[in-house]
Amino acid sequence: SWLTQQAGSNNNSNGTVALGAQYTDNSGNYNARFWGYQFDNYGTLMYGDGTINFPIKGSKNSFSFAAQFATDQQWLQASNAMTNAATGAGNIQSYVAGVNLGWAYDTNLWQVNLSADTMWGPDNAWGGGAIVSPYTQALQVDPVYTEAWSYNMVTQGQPGNMYKAQAQYALGWWGQNLLFRPVYVYVANNNPATNGLQELDLILNYAIPQVRGLNVFGAYAQQWYSPNANNDPALGSTVPNGNYQPIEIQASIFYTW
């Protein structure tokens, strides 16, 4: 379990209350979103982002700029599952900010995105300023721009900085149904195991045109831990079994509607 439970503590949740809003102008070039989650027994997460697109008149090129901000707090709750389960754990208090610069040609045909995120909080807060997102933990669907397939700051509960370069290309005669996405991320934080971590992801997604919503998906992810990374479990290492170059491969078929 990602949360170790001590005797007498409670890591259950009675549910979540969520509220969100989104605005897009008539041109589709400006978009803003805001949402909030009240996680019972875990905290309150607030998130907002905005994107501006700059299409180049007379060409298929466009540029974009996006920014995001999030905060996770222990509002409306006297305690939470983490502080109850761990001796000396601090309250939830985390902040995240990020930017993304993008270029696209013919929408999905070619894309390049460069992004950076920083997560911080007081040293005496839970995880030194980590975000708590219990219902997306380990699902890799948290909205930070620099999320990688195998590592992101929310899932690992590790504040710090992340940098990401991502491209997208619609492959050949398959048209825009078969998308290839290479991704590179770099991690810079105060964690003795993951500081300097690098990850390369190669992702394929094919939307089967004959069946609307049916997709074939594949992912290859490889990480390189810093040669100086701590691999002592007693010191909180996350280097998996001393493996400094772990590989993850996944393939799936999924349907959305």
State what each model feature region is.
Residues 1-53:
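Internal metal/ion-chelating core segments
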Residues 3-7, 36, 81-88, 149-154, ...:
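Extracellular loop and loop/strand-boundary signature of outer-membrane beta-barrel proteins
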Residues 11-15, 37-47, 157-161, 188-198, ...:
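Solvent-exposed loop/turn segments connecting transmembrane beta-strands
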Residues 19, 165, 243-257:
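Outer-membrane beta-barrel "beta-signal"
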Residues 24, 29, 49-188:
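Detector for outer-membrane/organellar transmembrane beta-barrel domains
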Residues 82-86, 129-138, 196-199, 233-244:
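Flexible, surface-exposed loop regions and adjacent strand-edge segments
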Residues 161, 176-217:
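A C-terminal functional module that forms or caps the active site or interfaces directly
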Residues 216-237:
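C-terminal beta-signal and adjacent terminal beta-strands/loops
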